[in-house]
Design a protein with these regions (language model features):
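Glycine/small-residue-rich loop that forms an oxyanion/phosphate-binding "nest" at active or ligand-binding sites
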Residues: 3-46
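Short, small-residue-enriched loops and turns at beta-alpha junctions
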Residues: 21-25, 103, 120
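Conserved phosphate/ATP/ADP-binding segment of small-molecule kinases
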Residues: 30-110
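Glycine/charged-rich beta-loop-alpha catalytic/anionic-binding loops adjacent to active sites
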Residues: 107-120
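Short glycine/threonine-rich catalytic loop with a Thr-x-Gly-x-Asp
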Residues: 117-132, 145-146
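Conserved post-catalytic alpha-helical subdomain immediately downstream of the catalytic base
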Residues: 133-176
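Charged C-terminal helix
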Residues: 158-202
Length: 202
């Protein structure tokens, strides 16, 4: 990971960090900080518990999912937006905090995104998919990293909603939902994305 990150930096390619499980074990936390120390990341994407670990150096999560006590709610939204901007400033990177409410921020501006469906949590790998899409969008739009990241997050959320609608129509289950999600990502159009995105800026 270190060699790949260094080479990507040398080539001015976007580098996305998804610190899965940071705060859940000493090894994962130490690895996250080693990467942050050695590599300049374009985007840091994770759940709120992982982001709090990056900020403080330790966390309370017990696995790869966010600790329920950290969940972003309407009551904590403004404070979390301010936190995301501070973290972006400190790390010189776009911050994408994912969850029921997504926040994408740089030091000056934040987007709040309310797309997605709870069914997405029943499929392993959706976070990894999102990291890959963010990297692709940032690679295609290197001068608009914040907007590119927000668009990628919207894409995943809208696709999750459309996949769920298709699952219900077909009386299908979780395995089909995974395939439908990939289908919707691959079939997404600009018109469909713009029409479905539930996004505001702060």
């Amino acid at each position: 990971m270190l060699l790949a990150g260094r080479q990507a930096n040398a080539l001015s390619h976007p580098v996305v960090l998804d610190p899965v499980g940071a705060g859940a074990s000493p090894f994962r936390t130490e690895t996250t900080f080693n990467l942050l120390e050695d590599i300049a990341f374009t985007v840091i994407k994770g759940n709120i518990s992982e982001m709090k670990t990056i900020h403080s150096g330790s966390g309370t999560t017990k696995g790869v999912d966010a600790d329920i006590s950290d969940a972003v709610t309407e009551e904590t939204l403004e404070a979390t937006v301010a936190f995301a901007k501070r973290l972006a400033d400190r790390n010189e990177a776009v911050i994408a905090i994912t969850g029921a409410i997504d926040i994408v921020a740089d030091r000056d501006k934040a987007y709040i995104i309310r797309n997605g469906h709870p069914q997405m949590a029943k499929v392993s790998g959706t976070g990894c998919m999102l990291s890959a899409v963010i990297a692709a969008y940032c690679g295609a739009n290197p001068e608009q990293l914040l907007d590119a990241t927000a668009a990628a997050v919207c894409l995943m959320g809208v696709s999750g909603e459309l996949a769920y609608e298709r699952m219900i129509r077909n009386a299908a289950g979780t395995s089909s939902y995974r395939s439908y999600l990939i289908d919707e990502i691959s079939k997404m159009s600009a018109k469909k994305l713009e029409g479905g995105a539930k996004i505001e800026n702060r």
